Amino acid sequence: MNFTEFALNNNVAEAINDLGYTTATPIQEKAIPSLIDGKDLVGCAQTGTGKTAAFAIPIINHIHRIVGAGKKRKQIRTIILSPTRELAIQIAENFEALSKYTQIKTYVIYGGVNMEPQIKALKYGIDVLVATPGRFLDLYKQNYIKTDALHQLVIDEADLMLDMGFINDVRKIIKLTPPNRQTLMFSATMPMGVRELADEFLSNAVYVSVDPDSSTGANITQKTYLVEKEDKKKLLKHVLETQDLKNVLLFTRTKQGADNVVDFLQKEGYKADAIHGDKSQAARLQILEDFKNKQIDILVATDVASRGIDIQQLPFVINYDIPNIPEIYIHRIGRTGRAGEEGLALSFVGRDEKTYWHDIEKLIRLQVKVVKDNPFPWREPNPNAKKDLRNKNKSAATGNSNKKNSTQNSASRKSDASKKNKKRWY
């Protein structure tokens, strides 16, 4: 579907054209008409499907129709809640690009930085506020955020909100907004907590979804190493040394895992650092900048922290931990091999991650090449180990049986003696 078919305002259409957008993505094609009609909407779509533009375009079109080209004092018309600072910044940048031919003012607020510039911007007046839940509530309590003129509330990455423990803050924020608002909720997955939130706060919502992209870039070489969990660090060192990998983005499942890998790499003499939710905003931005400037060779990241990161010309991705959601694998390795560049994605599959890996290969419809030149492969189970274990269990069972019989015999003897020496009470 072409964007010209949406009957958008000329100012919005011109910005879309400048960005090189001509044909709507599936989520945009399904969501934009309903949003233009003012309906509540729940969208199930992965990051990278064009979902930000799917809600940004109709929102900008709506606000521009209301405020026009005037420069009168601004009021918050739209609030977008985002779970992470990086995603919030990315959303704000998209809004600015799509509204550049309008008078719409977008501003982003998040924690970990000085409040004063944010307070100043809110006092001056804005149309679109992008915020992380915690900082929103902080500034609302101080009376710097007004929701009286609110038309739309967007909850982005709702499943991440749930995972990161923000869902109660989101509930509080929703209750601070006018009941006649238009509410939009987007999520990569639909766990029970997200569905309950939608049922509670959305009215006659339209549900749209797009199937996750199961394809990986043609110019990304994928390889896998079958490695025991306890050998992953040794394998990582081997791979880095033998393949001379630099400018590597390495993924772990947890923050603790990320810090653990960084400690190991630094002790081995590598320039490595991690980004995750426990790092301050200033620290994360500085680490990213150092990585982009090649001052850090290996950037270790969790999936949550990595959402919203845009790194151009990234040659290598390592899946140190295999994700338990197959679509995350596609998102991870999609960071490399962009803009015609070649990319390499290596995955360290532990024995306990076999099921995850099977699901990934099923999704991408590809059996990824297993590297044979691997000094730390899965160890073959010892055939005598099970036999020894069975014999041990058998011996233990026999011993217990003998002990039981001995106890029973003893009890029986005692009973016979009692019959002779003790009077019955009856």
Please report, for each region that a protein language model flagged, where it lies by residue.
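Basic Arg/Gly/Lys-rich low-complexity intrinsically disordered segments
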Residues: 69-71, 293, 361-426
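Conserved helicase RecA-like core
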Residues: 2-379
